[in-house]
C-alpha cells in the first residue's frame, strides 16, 4: 500500500490546536473510507514525556502497547478509530539517544555523526516505519516554526517530501490571524511572516489553516492566498468553537478533505459525519447537569487530566447530562477540611505521584464513603480508597502505601516487583530501577468477578485496560480488608494483582488501578465513566439508591 503524507506545522504562537486540526482532518478522511494514521514528532530532548511534570507538559497518554506519549495522541484516538502505538510518537531525545547508541556500537563505521544526514535520516526512517499500511499518514511536528530545536524535524520532512515525490506529500501550516478591536479587522501579517519563515527552510505550505476568533472574511483570505502563494480555496478558517468536536464539520464545509483527495489522486466517497452530528446534538441538548469534584494535585493545569476531563464529558453525552468539573486541590481538603467537597454530585480522584496532598485525597475518599456520594478512583484514586477503608473500617490504624511511608505498620499498597505483561512475559522491577519507562504500562487483561458492579457496567467477564503505575495492593493484607467488607471486583491476567475494588455497602463506590480514561471516545464513551455520571445524575435528582 502506498502511503500519502500530510505534514502539519504551526506558526506565530504555540497552542494553536495543531493536534485538534490534524485529528479533525483525519476523522473526515476516515469517514470517507480511508485508512488513516497519525504521528506526533516532539522536538524536546526528553526521551519521552514519562518523567515530565504534568503541570509543565500536561498528561502522559499511554498507548495499548505501553508507550508513554504526548497528550495529542489522546486527541488522535478520540477522533479516529486507529489505535496509536509507540511508533506514533517520538522525541528529539529518543532520536539522539538511539543515534548515539548506534555510534557507540560502531554502526556508522567511524563516520562523523552530524544532524544532517544522521539525525534527519533517523527521523525519516521513523516516519516511514510508523506509517506503513495506511492510505494517509498525518504527521504533526511539535513546536513553532522558527524554534531552534525543531529545525532537524523540519529538514527531515522537507527531505522526505522530495524523496517520496510532491504528489504524495502535502504541507499544512496552522497560523494565527488575530482580530484587532481597535482597527476593527483581522490582521494577516503574522501569517505572512510565518510562511516566510517556513519558506526560508525550503517548505512551501499547500494548505493554510487560519486560527481566529471568527471566520476569516473573503477579502482577507484572498490576501493571504496571494502573499503566501497558495490557492484561495486552500486558505481554511478555523474559528473558535464551543466544542472541539465541531471542528470536523467546520473544515469539511470548506472542502479541506476534497483538497487532500484531489492532491493525492484518491477517489473516495463523500464523508459520512453522522456520528459526529450525533455527538454535537447530544452535547447541545442535555436534559440536566451534574457537578463532579476532581480532587487532585495538578489542578492549576487542567491538561494534566486531559483524558479524564474528556471521558467525563463523553459520559455526559451518553447520559444527556452537562458535566461541570470542579477542580479541588487535595491540599485544600487537608487545610480547609471536607467542607470544600460539599454540594458535589460525585467525586473523582485521578492518578498522581508523590506524597503532596495525599492525605487530602484520602479524606475525599472517606467523605464519599461516609456521605454516600458516588466515587470513582483511578490508579492512585483506588489506592487512597483502599488506604482509607483499611484505616477507618478494617481497623488498620496508620495503614498507608510504602510510596509515602516505608515504615507503616500496615503497608496495604506496595511496589510491584513482578507481573505478567499483555504478551504473557514476566516483567520485574526493583526500587533501584530508573524512573523512566519502568512502570507497569499498556493494555492488560483483567478478570471481573460475578455479581459486582464492575461486571454489570462492562457487561463482560474479561476486559482490557491500560496501566501506568508502580504500586499495587499488598496481597498479604488483602484478606483482612476484604473481611471488613471491601470487594475486590477485578484481578490481573494471572489473578494475582488487584485491578478493581468496590464497596457493596455504598450506592456507587468503584475504583480501578488502571486508567479507563485512555479508551474513552466521544462516539462510544466508556462504561465505567458512563455508570459514574449516571450515578451522579441520580444523586443530583435525589434518586440514588
Swiss-Prot record:
Endpoints of the signal sequence: none
Family matches, as Pfam families: CTP_synth_N, GATase
Cellular component, GO, one term: cytosol
Gene Ontology molecular function terms on file: ATP binding; CTP synthase activity; glutaminase activity; identical protein binding; metal ion binding
Residues that bind UTP: 14, 187-192, 223
Catalytic activity as recorded in UniProt: UTP + L-glutamine + ATP + H2O = CTP + L-glutamate + ADP + phosphate + 2 H(+); L-glutamine + H2O = L-glutamate + NH4(+); UTP + NH4(+) + ATP = CTP + ADP + phosphate + 2 H(+)
EC number: 6.3.4.2
Residues that bind ATP: 15-20, 72, 239-241
Binding site for CTP: 14, 147-149, 187-192, 223
Segments traversing the membrane: none
Record family assignment: Belongs to the CTP synthase family.
NCBIfam families with a match to the protein in the record: PRK05380.1, PyrG
Name under which the protein is recorded: CTP synthase
Gene: pyrG
Amino acid at each position: 500500500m502506498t502511503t500519502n503524507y500530510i505534514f502539519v506545522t504551526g506558526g506565530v504562537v504555540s497552542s494553536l490546536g495543531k493536534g485538534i486540526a490534524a485529528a479533525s482532518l483525519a476523522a473526515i478522511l476516515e469517514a470517507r473510507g480511508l485508512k488513516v494514521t497519525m504521528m506526533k514528532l516532539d522536538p524536546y530532548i526528553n526521551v519521552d514525556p514519562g518523567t515530565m511534570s504534568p503541570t509543565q507538559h500536561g498528561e502522559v497518554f499511554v498507548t495499548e502497547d505501553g508507550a508513554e506519549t504526548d497528550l495529542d495522541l489522546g486527541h488522535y484516538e478520540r477522533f479516529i478509530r486507529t489505535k496509536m502505538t509507540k511508533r506514533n510518537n517520538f522525541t528529539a531525545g529518543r532520536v539522539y539517544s538511539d543515534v548515539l547508541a548506534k555510534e557507540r556500537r560502531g554502526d556508522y563505521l567511524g563516520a562523523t555523526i552530524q544532524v544532517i544526514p544522521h539525525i534527519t535520516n533517523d527521523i525519516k526512517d521513523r516516519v516511514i516505519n510508523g506509517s506503513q499500511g495506511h492510505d494517509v499518514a498525518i504527521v504533526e511536528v511539535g513546536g513553532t516554526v522558527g524554534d531552534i530545536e525543531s529545525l532537524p524535524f523540519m529538514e527531515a520532512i522537507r527531505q522526505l517530501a522530495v524523496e517520496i515525490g510532491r504528489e504524495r506529500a502535502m504541507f499544512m501550516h496552522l497560523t494565527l490571524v488575530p482580530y484587532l478591536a481597535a482597527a476593527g479587522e483581522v490582521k494577516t501579517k503574522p501569517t505572512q511572516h510565518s510562511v516566510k519563515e517556513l519558506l526560508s527552510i525550503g517548505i512551501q505550505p499547500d494548505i493554510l489553516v487560519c486560527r481566529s476568533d471568527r471566520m476569516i472574511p473573503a477579502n482577507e483570505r484572498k490576501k493571504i492566498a496571494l502573499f503566501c502563494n497558495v490557492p484561495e480555496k486552500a486558505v481554511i478558517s478555523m474559528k473558535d468553537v464551543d466544542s472541539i468536536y465541531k471542528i470536523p464539520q467546520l473544515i469539511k464545509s470548506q472542502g479541506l478533505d476534497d483538497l487532500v483527495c484531489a492532491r493525492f489522486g484518491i477517489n473516495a466517497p463523500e464523508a459520512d459525519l453522522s456520528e459526529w452530528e450525533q455527538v454535537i446534538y447530544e452535547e447541545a441538548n442535555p436534559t440536566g447537569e451534574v457537578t463532579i469534584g476532581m480532587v487532585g494535585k495538578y489542578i492549576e493545569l487542567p491538561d494534566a487530566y486531559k483524558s479524564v476531563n474528556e471521558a467525563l464529558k463523553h459520559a455526559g453525552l451518553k447520559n444527556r447530562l452537562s458535566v461541570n468539573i470542579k477542580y479541588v486541590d487535595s491540599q485544600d481538603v487537608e487545610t480547609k477540611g471536607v467542607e470544600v467537597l460539599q454540594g458535589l454530585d460525585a467525586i473523582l480522584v485521578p492518578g498522581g505521584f508523590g506524597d503532596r496532598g495525599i492525605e487530602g485525597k484520602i479524606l475525599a475518599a472517606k467523605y464519599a464513603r461516609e456521605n454516600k456520594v458516588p466515587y470513582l478512583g483511578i490508579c492512585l484514586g483506588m489506592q487512597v480508597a483502599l488506604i482509607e477503608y483499611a484505616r477507618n473500617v478494617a481497623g488498620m490504624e496508620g495503614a498507608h502505601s510504602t510510596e509515602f511511608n516505608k515504615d507503616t505498620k500496615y503497608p496495604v499498597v506496595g511496589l510491584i516487583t513482578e507481573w505478567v505483561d499483555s504478551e504473557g512475559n514476566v516483567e520485574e522491577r526493583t526500587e533501584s530501577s530508573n524512573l523512566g519507562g519502568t512502570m507497569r504500562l499498556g493494555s492488560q487483561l483483567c478478570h471481573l468477578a460475578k455479581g459486582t458492579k464492575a461486571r454489570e457496567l462492562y457487561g463482560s467477564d474479561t476486559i482490557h485496560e491500560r496501566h501506568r503505575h508502580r504500586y499495587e495492593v499488598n496481597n498479604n493484607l488483602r484478606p483482612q480488608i476484604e473481611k471488613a467488607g471491601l470487594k475486590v471486583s477485578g484481578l490481573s491476567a494471572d489473578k494475582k494483582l488487584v485491578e478493581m475494588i468496590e464497596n457493596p455497602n455504598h450506592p456507587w463506590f468503584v475504583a480501578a488501578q488502571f486508567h479507563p480514561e485512555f479508551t474513552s471516545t466521544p462516539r462510544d464513551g466508556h462504561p465505567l465513566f458512563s455508570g459514574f455520571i449516571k450515578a451522579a445524575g441520580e444523586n443530583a435528582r435525589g434518586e440514588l439508591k
